[in-house]
């Protein structure tokens, strides 16, 4: 088949948002929540042509009558039937393409279970009949998007956080660290601390409201203790937020207590290290000769890194951990919310990449296991 004239599709399936579009574009065409919603009550909308499931924005807008489920948890697909619905929605409703006509580049979390990657491959070839596909590691794509081939990526999205050291384009698997603490946990934590203040947020629909509060009002304090003192002594840090029903709530130290959990997971009752220490530990697992390059190229990626103040705080924390003479540079590209997708768009449109695709023919000859041989 002539790959030249057919644009490849790039789909970055995140735990929170699905980003999809065409290789060669500079931004995804479609960005929608990775949600499948099902009616809570049977037959409440008789004659409305009610569907048995809704995907993405439509599920989000009808959330009041639906139970919302995220098929991707902690970066890994846990519900394949729902995942298939999301892919179907991506091809036919969002991009409006026939998947059997385009090669598809999918992304996956680092250290993804082998079976997951095989299942993705199988669904693409057997359910959607794609002519070719490839599975790339998310963090590596983020680094490509920043124009580098060496560096360490701290990728923190909605479901999972990874620190991935990459040297000359290859992820170093022995030094990848994973932290099951990301945006969704911060949302849950904000729900909890707002509930402690007497506001009630419990349902899956209300969780989405809290996510919005988090995205609009939270920030990372450079000095947590000092910020707490400021918040206690004045109302300068307080902000108000109007709920969908018109009620106005005031949020004070919760604004920075919520994302502080990234640096102090003990806030969530977790025994893990914070994102700064995880990044540092990852660098320390690498060969001593390349550490300098990693410290100087620490790239933030993923939606949770969009929280204001995170780069300065990372700079401060890593400087405190690293040798005193080390040059440390935290790179936070403005488009980092989509840098995985952008990296995929770059990769899939390279002429040198075209022989890397797994073709339908190779799949038919070798089965799903081919993915481990072709996608390192």
Swiss-Prot record:
Gene Ontology terms for molecular function? ATP binding; hydrolase activity
What does the UniProt entry say about where the protein is found? Cytoplasm, Cytoskeleton
Q: What is its EC number?
A: 3.6.4.-
Chain ranges passing through the membrane:
none
Q: What is its main location?
A: cytoplasm
**Which InterPro entries does the UniProt record give?**
Actin (IPR004000), Actin/actin-like_CS (IPR020902), Actin_CS (IPR004001), ATPase_NBD (IPR043129)
One Pfam family of this chain: Actin
* Keyword annotations: ATP-binding, Cytoplasm, Cytoskeleton, Hydrolase, Nucleotide-binding
**Gene Ontology CC: one annotated term:** cytoskeleton
Q: What class of enzyme is it?
A: hydrolase
| SUPFAM superfamilies, alphabetized | Actin-like ATPase domain
Question: Can you state which reaction this protein catalyses?
Answer: ATP + H2O = ADP + phosphate + H(+)
Give the function comment from the record: Actins are highly conserved proteins that are involved in various types of cell motility and are ubiquitously expressed in all eukaryotic cells.
Family affiliation: Belongs to the actin family.
Q: What is this protein called?
A: Actin
Which species is this record about? Answer: Brugia malayi
């Amino acid at each position: 088949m002539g790959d030249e004239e057919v644009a490849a599709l790039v789909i970055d399936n995140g735990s929170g948002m699905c980003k999809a579009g065409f290789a060669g574009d500079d931004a995804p065409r479609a960005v929608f929540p990775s949600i499948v919603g099902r009616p809570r009550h049977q037959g409440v909308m008789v004659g409305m042509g009610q569907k048995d499931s809704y995907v993405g924005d439509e599920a989000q807008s009808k959330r009041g009558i639906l139970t919302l489920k995220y098929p991707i948890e902690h970066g890994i697909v846990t519900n394949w039937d729902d995942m298939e619905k999301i892919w179907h929605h991506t091809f036919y409703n969002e991009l409006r393409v026939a998947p059997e006509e385009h090669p598809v580049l999918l992304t996956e979390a680092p250290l993804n279970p082998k079976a997951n990657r095989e299942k993705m491959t199988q669904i693409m070839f057997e359910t959607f009949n794609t002519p070719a596909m490839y599975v790339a590691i998310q963090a590596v794509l983020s680094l490509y998007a920043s124009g580098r081939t060496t560096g360490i990526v701290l990728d923190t999205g909605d479901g999972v956080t990874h620190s991935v050291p990459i040297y000359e384009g290859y992820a170093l698997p022995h030094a990848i660290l994973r932290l099951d603490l990301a945006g969704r946990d911060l949302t849950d934590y904000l729900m909890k601390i707002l509930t402690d203040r007497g506001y009630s947020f419990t349902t899956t629909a209300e969780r989405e409201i809290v996510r919005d509060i988090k995205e609009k009002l939270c920030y990372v304090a450079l000095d947590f203790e000092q910020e707490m003192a400021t918040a206690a002594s004045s109302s300068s840090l307080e902000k108000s937020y109007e709920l969908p029903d018109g009620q106005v709530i005031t949020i004070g130290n919760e604004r920075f207590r919520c994302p502080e959990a990234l640096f102090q997971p003990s806030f969530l009752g977790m025994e893990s290290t914070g994102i700064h220490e995880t990044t540092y530990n990852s660098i320390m697992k690498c060969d001593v000769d390349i550490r300098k390059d990693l410290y100087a190229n620490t790239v933030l990626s993923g939606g949770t890194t969009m929280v204001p103040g995170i780069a300065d705080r990372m700079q401060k924390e890593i400087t405190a951990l690293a040798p005193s003479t080390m040059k440390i540079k935290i790179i936070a590209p403005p488009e980092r919310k989509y840098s995985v997708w952008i990296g995929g768009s770059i990769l899939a449109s390279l002429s040198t990449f075209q022989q890397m695709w797994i073709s339908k023919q190779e799949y038919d000859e070798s089965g799903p296991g081919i993915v481990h041989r072709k996608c390192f």
